Structure formats: C-alpha cells, structure tokens
C-alpha cells in the first residue's frame, strides 16, 4: 500500500498550488525589467541635469540625442535671435556712418564750387583789363581765345613799329598821342585783313 501511495500521481489541488506559486515567479521578471528601464531612464535624466558641468553636459547631450525636437527648435530660435541682433547692430553702425560721409561730400562740393567761382571771376577780370589795353572796335565781340590772339598780334605789331623807327622822339615822349596813333594804326592793320588772316590760322 505504501508503494501505491508514493507512486500515485499528484492530486489536482497540489498541482494548482504549484502552478499558482510559479505564476508570480514568471510575472516578476517582466516587472523587474520594466522597473529597471524606468530606473535607468530616471538615472539618465538625473545625471544629465545634476552631473559635473550639468548645464554644459545637458546642452551637449540634448544636441547629440536625435529624440529631442524641442531642444533643436529652441537652438534654432536662439540662433535666429542672435543673427538678427548682429544684423541690427550692423545696420545701426552703417546708419551712423552714412550721414557723416554725406555731410563730408556736401562740404567738399560746396568748397569746389566756391573755388571755381573765384577762379572764373578772377579770369573774367583779367580779360576785361586786357580788352581795355588792346585797341578794339565798337563792333567787336571777342571771345576769350580771340582776345588772347588779338593781344598777341598787338604785341607783334608794337614790336614791328619799334623796329621800323617810324615814331620820332616827340611822338614817343607823349604817351597819350603815341597810344592813340598806335591804336589807329592797329585798327587800320586789322581792317586791311591781317587780323582776319591771323585769326583763321
């Protein structure tokens, strides 16, 4: 009878107890794995924020991890703001420098205009004095180049008169009479065609 009892199969009650004891053991490893994963993720987040050089390390780690789109957007926004600030600074510097250069150009133009007016005025005064010396006809309307050519011809005419000794000592002593006679002679010389021929050359 003892052999029959030992060799008898396990009762259903004992089998259910053993199965119920094994089921918690089987269910525990997955929960342990999940808890380990949660603990690892919490350790990673805590290590990124509170480790040595946490701010710098967290920034570098966030940039390296592909699964952080929020940090990438923040980086882009900060970079865009920095670029706009630098561009605004450049615009302010260029805007501050442009009025000075414009004022300098204006002053240079004004000074150049003043110098040009002074030069033109002095030149006109010199030609007016030269026209008073050269014997001219009432109908003459000489330009500046014609006045210079006429003055050169008048100097040449005076040289020829002095070389020919046509004037006596009495006429030479009276400057007014000599000037009138030379003016008349030069006018005749012009009317004869010498001036028109010389002006054409």
From Swiss-Prot:
It is found in: Nucleus. Residues 1-104 are annotated as: Disordered. Residues 34-43 have a biased composition (Basic residues). Its main location: nucleus. Residues 107-158 form the bHLH domain. GO terms for cellular component: nucleus. Pfam families: HLH (PF00010). Residues 46-65, 80-98 have a biased composition (Gly residues). Keywords: Activator, Biological rhythms, Developmental protein, Differentiation, DNA-binding, Myogenesis, Nucleus, Repressor, Transcription, Transcription regulation. It comes from the Eukaryota. Residues 1-18 have a biased composition (Low complexity). Disulfide bonds: none annotated. The keyword Nucleus applies. The keyword Transferase does not apply. Residues 160-190 are annotated as: Sufficient for transactivation activity. CDD domains: bHLH_TS_TWIST1 (cd11412). One of its GO terms (molecular function) is DNA-binding transcription factor activity, RNA polymerase II-specific. PROSITE patterns: BHLH. GO terms for biological process: cell differentiation; muscle organ development; negative regulation of DNA-templated transcription; rhythmic process. PANTHER family: BASIC HELIX-LOOP-HELIX TRANSCRIPTION FACTOR, TWIST, TWIST-RELATED PROTEIN 1. Efficient DNA binding requires dimerization with another bHLH protein. Homodimer or heterodimer with E proteins such as TCF3. ID1 binds preferentially to TCF3 but does not interact efficiently with TWIST1 so ID1 levels control the amount of TCF3 available to dimerize with TWIST and thus determine the type of dimer formed. Acts as a transcriptional regulator. Inhibits myogenesis by sequestrating E proteins, inhibiting trans-activation by MEF2, and inhibiting DNA-binding by MYOD1 through physical interaction. This interaction probably involves the basic domains of both proteins. Also represses expression of pro-inflammatory cytokines such as TNFA and IL1B. Regulates cranial suture patterning and fusion. Activates transcription as a heterodimer with E proteins. Regulates gene expression differentially, depending on dimer composition. This is Twist-related protein 1. It comes from Macaca tonkeana. The lineage of its organism: Eukaryota, Metazoa, Chordata, Craniata, Vertebrata.
């Amino acid at each position: 009878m003892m052999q029959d009892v030992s060799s008898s199969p396990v009762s259903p009650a004992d089998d259910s107890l053993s199965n119920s004891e094994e089921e918690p053991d089987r269910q525990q490893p997955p929960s342990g794995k999940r808890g380990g994963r949660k603990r690892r993720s919490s350790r990673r987040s805590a290590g990124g924020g509170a480790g040595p050089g946490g701010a710098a390390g967290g920034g570098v780690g966030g940039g390296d991890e592909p699964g952080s789109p929020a940090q990438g957007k923040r980086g882009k926004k900060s970079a865009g703001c920095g670029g706009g600030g630098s561009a605004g600074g450049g615009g302010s510097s260029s805007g501050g420098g442009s009025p000075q250069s414009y004022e300098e150009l204006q002053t240079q133009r004004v000074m150049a205009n003043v110098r040009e007016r002074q030069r033109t005025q002095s030149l006109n005064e010199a030609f007016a004095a030269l026209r008073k010396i050269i014997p001219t006809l009432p109908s003459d309307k000489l330009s500046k180049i014609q006045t210079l050519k006429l003055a050169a011809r008048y100097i040449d005419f005076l040289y020829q008169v002095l070389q020919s000794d046509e004037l006596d000592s009495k006429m030479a002593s009276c400057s007014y009479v000599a000037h009138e006679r030379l003016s008349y002679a030069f006018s005749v010389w012009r009317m004869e065609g010498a001036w028109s021929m010389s002006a054409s050359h």
